[in-house]
Amino acid sequence: MRIFKKAVFVIMISFLIATVNVNTAHAAIDVSAKSAIIIDGASGRVLYAKDEHQKRRIASITKIMTAVLAIESGKMDQTVTVSANAVRTEGSAIYLTEGQKVKLKDLVYGLMLRSGNDAAVAIAEHVGGSLDGFVYMMNQKAEQLGMKNTRFQNPHGLDDHENHYSTAYDMAILTKYAMKLKDYQKISGTKIYKAETMESVWKNKNKLLTMLYPYSTGGKTGYTKLAKRTLVSTASKDGIDLIAVTINDPNDWDDHMKMFNYVFEHYQTYLIAKKGDIPKLKGTFYESKAFIKRDITYLLTEEEKENVKINTTLLKPKKAWEKDASKIPDIVGHMEIMFNDATIAKVPIYYENERHQKPKKQFFETFKSIFLNAAGGAKWSI
């Protein structure tokens, strides 16, 4: 077939889906925070932002990183001996005493629910070996996550260091990562906790979770005299997971609910590419054989049209493949999803064989499909 005379061929399919109008979101959402952001927890797409890259003091939302490192240390069931240094830490506390023996898990709950600064230091000393060692781990993790405008100097966020700062954007990145950890999800979303190794019962300070917002799934509060009110919160509704961050915001509860409600009202998750067979390959070598292993979804508004494209690139089939299927590579191409001329997803295309089986067909879909209702035929570029 002439269509295979080049090394690759590209199938480009355009869909009638809407364009994100960021200006519309900015006009509809007005927050009092100095910095703010709300992102899709699945894709990381920024849905609204205000000075999101401005470096600012962040107060106790610092403790999200402290919790992440404690959880990932694998030491949650270990017993921590509380130091005098931890006990002397000023500010909010869970009232530890010197020499007290507490399970690390209890300290992390006290850190997240009651914002215990003493717990933060006890965690840091146990997990990092010392405060300096733990701070090094915090900054190393921040670098790994791409938090380019963040610098940690302590595990709690107190104003004792000039160069302790982050941004709304970076804290959203951190929280997106943290929410992938089951222990973090559970702790962050706990309303009341009874400590296992202390005579304490703690209620979460996050009023969105405990009182104000039915779709809240967790978060972390913060306040210092210099940072003012800071807040990270998460919410879920109808399969949409959101992350909101505000820094220096006197009306943070209201602003978070305002951002959440706007997104839940105007956005929905669309199925852009369905796992399994790739349409528009009829009459080709790859018909009924080329497939992707996962659904590709994206959060979009109803108004967004014509700005999502799928570029499917496949290897040119060789004559030897027709004679001996074992010579066909496992991965024969890739599917690239473009939105507003930017790549939002790129997944490998597999050729069905004994090692790679197509996903089973699903009879029910949870997402609104735009892939199956594509307008027009395929455009071939050779």
From Swiss-Prot:
Signal peptide residue numbers: 1-27
Pathway as given in its UniProt record: Cell wall biogenesis; peptidoglycan biosynthesis
Bilayer topology term: Peripheral membrane protein
UniProt-annotated binding residues for substrate: K220
Enzyme Commission identifier(s): 3.4.16.4
Record bears the keyword GTP-binding: no
Subcellular location, record wording: Forespore outer membrane
Single GO MF descriptor: serine-type D-Ala-D-Ala carboxypeptidase activity
Record keywords: Carboxypeptidase, Cell shape, Cell wall biogenesis/degradation, Hydrolase, Membrane, Peptidoglycan synthesis, Protease, Signal, Sporulation
Family named by the database record: Belongs to the peptidase S11 family.
Protein name: D-alanyl-D-alanine carboxypeptidase DacB
Organism: Bacillus subtilis (strain 168)
